[in-house]
Amino acid sequence: MIEAWRRIFPGADAVGRDLLARYSEPHRRYHTPAHLARMLEVIDAHAELAADPDAVRLAAWFHDAVYDTFAPDNEERSASLASTTLAALGFSPERTAEVARLVRLTAGHNVEPGDRNGALLADADLAILASEAADYAGYAAAVRAEYAAVPDDVFRPGRAAILRKLADLPELFRIVPARAEWTARARANLESEIASLLGAR
């Protein structure tokens, strides 16, 4: 993974290793280096669709840098970390602001028309939703494990509400060429998990 960081910013290994350490925190089960690697694979495969592919890659690295399951402001804190870190590394204010904006966007995945950077980042972050059923089940189980301290009668309706908000987005995927196929599979996965969550109460 550090090689992927070096391709974006050679000479700043300490920052890359700090980010990987954050993604490797013991309370994480889904928001791990594997999630970051999958996002980067999607971004790399469709880099030509973004206005600034490296800004999208940097946003992927920072978007879950702060992850506290009980905090409502993880994306904002991750964006602040990105701003501080990139400014210290000598990035321009404009590019630093763009990366921070993209990190904040992952809070709700609300992408404005014409925002190619935001569209690619959001598609990469949500790509897991379009995975095959077995992989999706693993993702759902990993998310549940991150919230192991939350009782079922609280977790289930809360998780179902989050999934319903995603399922009701006018566009789940916005820019990847396979978005129609991804959307169909993602909606099927989401509806299946929602039914399981609400039916098991």
Annotate each predicted stretch with a short phrase:
Residues 1-7, 24-31, 41-50, 62, ...:
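Divalent metal-dependent phosphate-bond-processing catalytic cores, especially two-metal-ion Mg2+/Mn2+ enzymes
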Residues 39, 54-69, 78, 101-107:
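His-Asp-centered metal-binding catalytic motifs of divalent-metal-dependent phosphohydrolases/nucleases
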Residues 25-35, 67-79, 93:
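Active-site metal-coordination segments of metallo-dependent hydrolases
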Residues 2, 6, 16-17, 40, ...:
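An amphipathic alpha-helix signature
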Residues 13-20, 33, 57, 96-104:
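Short, well-structured alpha-helical segments
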Residues 49-55, 72-74, 91-95:
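Short, flexible active-site-proximal loops enriched in glycine and acidic residues
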Residues 16, 36, 53-58, 99, ...:
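Short runs of predominantly hydrophobic/aromatic residues within well-ordered alpha helices
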Residues 22, 78-112:
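Histidine- and acidic-residue-rich, metal-dependent catalytic cores
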